[in-house]
Amino acid sequence: MAKAPKRAFVCNECGADYPRWQGQCSACHAWNTITEVRLAASPTVARNERLSGYAGSAGVSKVQKLSDISLEELPRFSTGFKEFDRVLGGGVVPGSAILIGGNPGAGKSTLLLQTLCKLAEQMKTLYVTGEESLQQVAMRAHRLGLPTANLNMLSETSIEQICLIAEEEQPKLMVIDSIQVMHMADIQSSPGSVAQVRETAAYLTRFAKTRGVAIVMVGHVTKDGSLAGPKVLEPCIDCSVLLDGDADSRFRTLRSHKNRFGAVNELGVFAMTEQGLREVSNPSAIFLSRGDEVTSGSSVMVVWEGTRPLLVEIQALVDHSMMANPRRVAVGLEQNRLAILLAVLHRHGGLQMSDQDVFVNVVGGVKVTETSADLALLLAMVSSLRDRPLPQDLVVFGEVGLAGEIRPVPSGQERISEAAKHGFRRAIVPAANVPKKPPEGMQVFGVKKLADALSVFDDL
């Protein structure tokens, strides 16, 4: 007589396990997120035999001295997109597990289909689709004008069958589209559930490590823009990237949130065209599409995205409020940071905006999280309040403290050099970031306090 399947209760938000149902998850403190899942009494023998030895070789693992382990780096291979390679840390590492997420229509499947069609001419690849039919994928490839002669396709949702076929085909790169529709026979729950997503991702990661196959898994996102699935999915994978972009914009940004083989928060920029995604080699140019007319409330700053500087424009609109509680709206910037800077501007700059509506926006849909944008945001708000434009050739960056001091930011010299490459001739930066030898033709103003920055602005 077969044993009854085991039951478990798992949180949909963080993946914590519980022996019985409860209203609130004690790990992430979310309410009504714990659901029941059914597990098989024991895993199949074939599954354990096929994928024993997680860290790279089948069989029983052996204890080794750290000094005896080879330091030879695994050879990476290019995806065919320099921007994609940059986000991955220099290319794809064999045996790595990569998770790519994004909103519907962002271009995840298009980017991966273009990548595999390019690589199929050099190496063996496999594209596994569980959401679209093979005919639909073929029509999309034909519409984009991609070479399809050497690309291997598979329509399957069973992870066990996919790994068996992949073991026969032995591809160097395999795409799973998507992880939410895959399932395992051992897990008696519907595809897309917490248990299925967690176990299928762990199963694929184990297969990638033991067989040396690089696997890219496509994942959906939730309402708040985070990758769908439990938090325990993150330790299973080596690299997590997110493809983002506004529905009314043709530009897409690819950002890494976790990378064991490269820098985190690395940014790649693509443009959606009729021939698919095309990489943008100079992202600063698209984020600085300023008109010839000089307007108030606009400033340019240099943010540091991963391993490269990026010039972005910050716009501010300060207007008299007709309501008792003035509005404070921030797009692309943190709302709490805006409130702090308004208080600092009032206390240490002598400018009161308690009766003003304040709207700030980062042009191009870029999300700026680093504090180096503080000084540029403050000067943009002052420019809008006074209706006095900042010079077109001025770049600003620096962190503003609660005492009104201007703090230095990392990579100040590189930021100034990047601004000089794009034709900027003046810069307001923290005094500690002033280079000993500024770029030729660049005038750098070092400021220590907010009052110093406002004084420089008055003299420009």
Language-model features: where?
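Conserved Rossmann-like nucleotide-cofactor binding loop
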Residues: 132-133
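Peripheral, non-AAA+ core regions of ATP-driven protein-machinery
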Residues: 2-13, 17-86, 93-99, 106-117, ...
